Amino acid sequence: MEGVTLAHKQTGREHEISCAGLFCFIGARPATAWLGDSVLLDSDGFILTDRQLIGTLGAETARALPFETSRLGVFAAGDVRHGSMKRVAAAVGEGSSAVRSVHERLAKET
């Protein structure tokens, strides 16, 4: 890699930058504003799950499964979760692990 060409989304104007590498930080800022106060977030807007809820919900925390949020039956995984690694492979792994917790929660509810 020798460089990149950046294009302004609105004007189309291009700007070239010499560089030896490019690092994408998708997920560096969580897009959680739409959640409102439906689940607990940290001060940066990342979703709190399972162990991070200790002391915030009392007895409810003991019931939280891995990747479960402050709202029973609602799960979060990947970059949007507080304490996640912010890497694609880790997010994929968390997603598949969260599915197991979803199945466990559904089994408890039926």
Task: Pin down the residues of each PLM region.
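A conserved FAD-binding loop/helix module that cradles the flavin
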Residues: 60-72, 77-110
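A Rossmann-like FAD-binding core segment of flavoenzymes
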Residues: 1-61, 104-110
